[in-house]
């Protein structure tokens, strides 16, 4: 006899397939609904311009990278990384590996090269256990790694957009970002589910 889905997972699946952004993504042959989150951020904050170099952390299945290539044009460049595999996207240099591992970080830095990048973006999230005492520290560890990437590769006046889950450590992290960037906003895009703790910190004017 097969295992039955839990009530919560069945509810999530029902919500997922009814979601207008999931339906739009499917209709437009987009990688994921995350495409629309970044589009809303771009309409408000104007992070991406033609010819930019962008680092995409936690890139799979590719919604953000897919969006960014439409904004930066054929002279721009996206360097993307995820622990999961991702189907190729024209204009995206993809590295599969665990960003938490030093060898993967070094490989990513090698792909970036000697120059600095214009935007670092992170949609990374841990595999959630359902226990906030475990999940939130894991999520905060990933966003700290993303901020460390900014310190290493982001050009002065560059931008950073990162998915963060509200909980313990959020306020301290926000203060840390405010010390490094001139303008910092917290966004909750329409395409982000209301029940989700996720928000997006959008930081511009890197002081590095």
Curated annotation (Swiss-Prot):
Compartment list: Cytoplasm
Organism lineage: Bacteria, Pseudomonadati, Pseudomonadota, Gammaproteobacteria, Pasteurellales
GO MF term (any one): rRNA (uridine-2'-O-)-methyltransferase activity
Superkingdom assignment: Bacteria
Binding sites annotated in the UniProt record for S-adenosyl-L-methionine: 62, 64, 82, 98, 123
Assigned EC number: 2.1.1.166
Keyword terms of this UniProt record: Cytoplasm, Methyltransferase, rRNA processing, S-adenosyl-L-methionine, Transferase
Organism: Glaesserella parasuis serovar 5 (strain SH0165)
Name of the molecule in the record: Ribosomal RNA large subunit methyltransferase E
Purpose of the protein: Specifically methylates the uridine in position 2552 of 23S rRNA at the 2'-O position of the ribose in the fully assembled 50S ribosomal subunit.
Catalytic activity: uridine(2552) in 23S rRNA + S-adenosyl-L-methionine = 2'-O-methyluridine(2552) in 23S rRNA + S-adenosyl-L-homocysteine + H(+)
CDD domains with a match to the protein in the record: AdoMet_MTases
Annotated active site: 163 (proton acceptor)
Enzyme class (EC, first level): transferase
Example of a GO cellular component annotation carried by this entry: cytoplasm
Family classification: Belongs to the class I-like SAM-binding methyltransferase superfamily. RNA methyltransferase RlmE family.
């Amino acid at each position: 006899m097969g295992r039955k889905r839990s009530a919560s997972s069945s509810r999530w699946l029902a919500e997922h397939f009814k979601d207008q952004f999931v339906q739009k993504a499917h209709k437009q042959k987009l990688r994921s609904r995350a495409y629309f989150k970044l589009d809303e951020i771009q309409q408000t904050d104007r992070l991406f311009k033609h010819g930019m170099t962008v680092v995409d952390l936690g890139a799979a299945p590719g919604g953000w990278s897919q969006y960014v290539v439409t904004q930066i044009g054929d002279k721009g460049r996206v360097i993307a990384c995820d622990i999961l595999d991702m189907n190729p996207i024209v204009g995206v240099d993809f590295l599969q590996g665990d960003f938490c591992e030093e060898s993967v970080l070094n490989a990513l830095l090698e792909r970036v090269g000697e120059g600095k990048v214009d935007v670092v973006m992170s949609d990374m999230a841990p595999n959630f256990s359902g226990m906030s005492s475990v999940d939130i520290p894991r999520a905060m560890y990933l966003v700290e790694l993303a901020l460390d990437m900014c310190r290493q590769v982001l050009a002065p006046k560059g931008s950073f957009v990162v998915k963060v889950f509200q909980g313990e450590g959020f306020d301290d992290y926000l203060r840390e970002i405010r010390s490094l960037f001139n303008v910092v906003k917290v966004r909750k895009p329409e395409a982000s589910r209301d029940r989700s703790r996720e928000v997006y910190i959008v930081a511009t004017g890197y002081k590095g």
